[in-house]
């Protein structure tokens, strides 16, 4: 089997998709809804604040379609940090009005497809390339209301496997 390319890993990512229990929300007393909103805003502010400390970032996005209402996205330096962020939301009053419909855990990375020189300690790497690569392994989340997300898996069934192709062929794709 062909070897996968060398990689450099960055932050771990949790894509936490949630639906809102709209019936429970409408039935809740106004003070309970206000408290839920207040706790939700405080939760997000405290998790967005880690961006200033170079410990990751978080954001909430609206989801179109019928699979979820919200995407809470966390990027952190470890899986433990992701677990903590997820559990803290579940403890909020707002979390009581939501249910996780799906979640994906991944890690940001760059590979030798980007540049062999980046992985060669003897090579001098262009500063622009280094900046580009650092942006890939520690990305900044957009200040947008919507994002496009699709789960990526380069393994396609039992017989067609991306990693069966030689490195140069994969790099050309």
Model-derived regions: residue spans:
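An N-terminus-focused feature that recognizes amino-terminal "leader" regions
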Residues: 1-58
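Long compositionally biased, domain-poor regions of proteins
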Residues: 5, 39-55, 75, 79, ...
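Short, surface-exposed beta-edge/turn micro-motifs
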Residues: 11-12, 68-70, 145-147
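Structural preference for beta-strand elements that scaffold enzyme active sites
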Residues: 13-15, 102, 147-149
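Hydrophobic, ordered structural segments
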Residues: 18-23, 60-142, 152
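Short coil/turn segments at secondary-structure boundaries
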Residues: 28-30, 86-87, 164
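Generic detector of short, locally flexible boundary/turn motifs and exposed helical patches
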Residues: 33-39, 65-70, 113-116, 162, ...
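Surface-exposed interaction/gating patches
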Residues: 127-173
């Amino acid at each position: 089997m062909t070897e996968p390319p060398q990689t450099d890993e960055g932050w771990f990512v949790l894509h936490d998709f949630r639906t809102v229990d709209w019936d429970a929300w409408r039935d809740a007393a106004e003070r309970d809804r206000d408290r839920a909103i207040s706790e939700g805003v405080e939760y997000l502010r405290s998790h967005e604040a880690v961006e200033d400390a170079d410990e990751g970032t978080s954001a909430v996005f609206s989801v179109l379609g019928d699979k979820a209402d919200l995407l809470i996205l966390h990027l952190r330096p470890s899986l433990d940090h992701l677990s903590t962020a997820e559990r803290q939301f579940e403890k909020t009053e707002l979390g009581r009005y939501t249910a996780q419909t799906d979640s994906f855990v991944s890690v940001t990375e760059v590979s030798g497809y980007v540049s062999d020189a980046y992985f060669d300690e003897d090579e001098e790497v262009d500063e622009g390339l280094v900046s580009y690569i650092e942006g890939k392994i520690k990305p900044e989340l957009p200040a947008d209301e919507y994002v496009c997300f699709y789960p990526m898996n380069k393994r396609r069934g039992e017989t067609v496997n991306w990693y069966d192709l030689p490195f140069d062929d994969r790099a050309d794709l």
